Design a protein with these regions (language model features):
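Short S/T/G/P-rich N-terminal loop/turn motif that feeds into the first structured element of a domain
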Residues: 1-55, 63-69, 96-97
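C-terminal structural segments of small proteins and small subunits
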Residues: 62-93
């Protein structure tokens, strides 16, 4: 199995209730069930007030690297990426477990 973690940092001045952010969250929330390669899917807002913390996280799992690649290339995923690109930056980590 492959774990795919994504941590998002909202751009300066962008808040969680910004309509673009709300749309972006919903775009990713709705991926579960649309992309059959997803084996595990959870996402949520950070609770920590530490300055090093990121704002939003996605924790997902896939059977193998081919399934992860299918997910990454999927048009629904790419549409979500395009939304988030407008108001955030992010880091990822992919590892076997």
């Amino acid at each position: 199995m492959i774990r795919h973690l994504v941590l998002f940092k909202l751009d300066e001045g962008v808040e969680r209730d910004d309509p673009r952010v709300v749309e972006g969250v919903e775009a990713f929330r709705s991926l579960e069930g649309k992309i059959p390669e997803i084996r595990h899917w959870e996402l949520g807002w950070n609770l920590s007030d530490r300055p090093i913390a990121y704002d939003f996280a996605i924790n997902s799992a896939f059977d193998d690297q081919a399934a992860l690649r299918t997910y990454v290339d999927h048009p629904e995923h790419q549409a979500g990426v395009a939304l988030w690109r407008e108001f955030s930056s992010w880091v990822i980590a992919d590892y076997e477990f």
